[in-house]
Amino acid sequence: MAFVNTLLRTIRCSAVHTLVQEGRSLSLLKASHQLTQSRKIMLSNHVRKEEAKSEPNETLDLEEWKSILKSDIGNAEMVKTETQEDSSLNEMQELVEMWRLAGRAVPQSITTEQLQVLMELPTKTARKKYLKYLSVREVMKTNRKEKKKELKESKSKIESLDQLETKEDTPEKKNTFLLHVWDKSIDTMQRWKCVQAMKFGQPLVFDMVYEKNMSRYELENTVCQLMESEGWNRRSTDPFHIYFCSLQPYSMYHKELVKRYIGAWDNVFVTATDKSHVEMFPKEQLVYLTADSPNELKHFDHTKIYIIGSLVDRCQQTGLSLANAKRLNLATARLPLDRYLKWDVGAKNLTLDQMIRILLCLKDTGDWKKALSFVPNRKHDGFAEPAASKKRNIKNDGGMEYAASTKRNLQKNSKMYKFGASKSFIKPERTDDTSIRSTRKRWWEEEN
């Protein structure tokens, strides 16, 4: 287009110069000017029509425009908050490094999650305590790793020596008639049992409403016990269908469980819900197990749904779970520890994994002695012997007379005072024989 216009201009200018030199009239100039202009306009109109065809009319949507503007503003705010968080995290990192240089108890490596927890703490003393706790935990972790390494090295040395001895003595046995069971097949079998329990098994509820009644350390310990309980349940022959009731999303319980399971939380065969156990099951079937209950659990009922409070055993808050059960009008029960164990001193609080092992054993066998063997020996002095009480069925008069005569004989034969049982305090028998009395001498006769 531009090339055509320039070409026309050059032709027109050359024509004007020739006409002026020859002395022609101006009418020809006007005609040539109109002709050149009309050609130029025709070309431009044609191009405009093509542009109009290629670019159709688009109507502007105001709501879309508003949403785009809002999203841009939100993104800008997000970027600002992220930059602020990064700056605050960097400041906390610098503060931790300064305290480390000052010689305070600070861990050598700290994660972003720990830095965020450190930022949320309100006071300086709380931050110091948390850093000290992290440093102590780090030292314990390193000590454990060193011990494991030493044990592995010692085991490897012993195994190498044993292998050398066996090679010298006997040849290796490669073939066997026993079928090797792989770990993968065992895992699939356990998962299949858990799936069947989730479909047809007896429910067991863990009440997750005690988050505010525990510190962070106690909550982490509780989550560890919950994971052990899930493992024992998965490995049992007849597992429970475990429910985590009142587990709020993004709560401390939920965050710690997701963190400990390392991406496998969605694959765990457990029903986690934010509803309470009262909303999930009928109240008539619920029994809350608590150590403060006045009712003793005499036998395991397969039709009931037992509830265990997710409290760590170190958090000895007496009456907390019992008050929660009474508030909801639920039946309560406690394990018969006094009846079967010599438990004189100390709180009767057990860990969550011990509770589920006791309940699994009761479910399979119904034997209290076998079930209570999972209670640690440091908490009691052994099993209590059953009292050997001989009960007589007295139905006739002869039986009544026999009982009365035995009672009289016992009263006659009891010759001991109440304050002692030694032989020096035995009462002498009274005799009515006067000859024996006459032979005895008085104290005034002995002097004469």
Swiss-Prot record:
Q: Which InterPro entries match?
A: MT_TRM10-typ, MT_TRM10-typ_sf, Trm10_C_MTase_dom, tRNA_m1G_MeTrfase_euk, tRNA_MeTrfase_TRMD/TRM10
Q: What is its EC number?
A: 2.1.1.-, 2.1.1.218, 2.1.1.221
Its GO CC terms are: mitochondrial nucleoid; mitochondrion
Family annotation (Gene3D superfamilies): 3.40.1280.30
Q: Which chain positions lie within coiled-coil regions? A: 137-165
> Main localisation, per the record?
mitochondrion
Record bears the keyword Methyltransferase: yes
Catalyzed chemical reaction(s): adenosine(9) in tRNA + S-adenosyl-L-methionine = N(1)-methyladenosine(9) in tRNA + S-adenosyl-L-homocysteine + H(+); guanosine(9) in tRNA + S-adenosyl-L-methionine = N(1)-methylguanosine(9) in tRNA + S-adenosyl-L-homocysteine + H(+); an adenosine in mRNA + S-adenosyl-L-methionine = an N(1)-methyladenosine in mRNA + S-adenosyl-L-homocysteine + H(+)
Q: Where in the cell is it found?
A: Mitochondrion matrix, Mitochondrion nucleoid
Q: Where is this region: Disordered?
A: 144-167, 429-448
Q: What quaternary arrangement does the UniProt entry report?
A: Component of mitochondrial ribonuclease P. Interacts with HSD17B10/MRPP2.
> What the protein does?
Mitochondrial tRNA N(1)-methyltransferase involved in mitochondrial tRNA maturation. Component of mitochondrial ribonuclease P, which cleaves tRNA molecules in their 5'-ends. Together with hsd17b10/mrpp2, forms a subcomplex of the mitochondrial ribonuclease P, named MRPP1-MRPP2 subcomplex, which displays functions that are independent of the ribonuclease P activity. The MRPP1-MRPP2 subcomplex catalyzes the formation of N(1)-methylguanine and N(1)-methyladenine at position 9 (m1G9 and m1A9, respectively) in tRNAs; trmt10c/mrpp1 acting as the catalytic N(1)-methyltransferase subunit.
Family to which the UniProt record says this protein belongs: Belongs to the class IV-like SAM-binding methyltransferase superfamily. TRM10 family.
Q: What is the protein name given in its UniProt record?
A: tRNA methyltransferase 10 homolog C
Task: Name its species.
Answer: Xenopus tropicalis (Western clawed frog)
Phylogenetic placement of the source organism: Eukaryota, Metazoa, Chordata, Craniata, Vertebrata
